[in-house]
Amino acid sequence: RTHLDSCDFSLGNYSAVTDPQDKEFKTFSLARDEKYILPYIRLAEQYAGHKIGVMLTPWSPPAFMKTNNDRNHGGKLLPEYADTWANYICRYIREYENRGITVEFLTVQNEPHATQTWDSCRYTHEEEREFLEKHLYPALQKAGLEKIKINLWDHNKERLFECASTCVTASTNAMIDGFAFHWYSGDHFDAVRLVREQYPDKRLIFTEGCIEYSFRDKDQLKNAQIYAHDMIGNFNAGMNLFFDWNIVLDEKGGPNHVSNLCDAPIMCNPNTKEVEYKLSYYYIAQFSHYVLPGAKRIAATCYTDKLETVSFVNPDGTFVVVLLNRTEQCMPVTLRIKGSLVACEIEANSITTIVCAAKGAAID
């Protein structure tokens, strides 16, 4: 996931076009992306050994397209610029693809119900639906970009169902790939589950969850547990994909042009070249390393609610069970899969992943 134009974690506000008269985007420039973003996507693909599908998310239209003439502090998209903004988004996608970057997902707006001191823009559910239906999707079709998977909401979970029930209509259903959500208002796993049950064909994607220094301490164990708890709860409720935001920050928790500094799984000091892998990095790896692309979550039961668990079956037939123990006591577990038993103990304040072969014999 990366930002279309600037976001709070940019070095400052910027837009690819700043001239209100440039409706044809002749001055369109991706210079900032070319310098600070695209090289890292290319490096990630190099290390992964395959192409990576990118999610593009706008935090705000250019200032001149908004009611407050400001990228920051909320405001709304001016109606007369709706088509221009839709075409701007299409141009951004095309510029990425012209540079060899695959844009797979697009969200309409980051946190559309929030007025932030940084890049932000407000939409009601009805306004987001109207922009999608009458402006964005037609523009994508005209540009030959209808393959892009559009996800709505991209905000906290507690209003996820409200967004889905408002935005999915007979005319928009085929336009909507799914819904994106954040964790800032609490667990709300039932909201995720409700959307999964009512809209089983829609993708559910976690797109953002920062550990803000202004609200939380720097306790590595607590922060790692926040990640694992949310991932387990969301996966059990029907989540399909998890994006970390941000996986890498500098030693201060930035850069961030409004000092909204945060913790991250990987912290780097650009001056000393030191890299610190936080405990949260290894907690996330319990999922990302063992749960393979194409895996399916499977049903499982547990004898106590003091142990948080989620189970998957990989495309190769292996079973993966992730167990999170946030208590101060060691928890005994006997894992039963297809008649085979594996006994183990889950240490206090720990996360454990068990991988079993298709027939139930433990292999890791």
Each language-model region and where it sits:
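Active-site loop signature of alpha/beta-hydrolase-fold enzymes
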Residues: 62, 111, 212
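Short, conserved phosphate-binding/catalytic loop or strand-edge motifs used
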Residues: 108-114
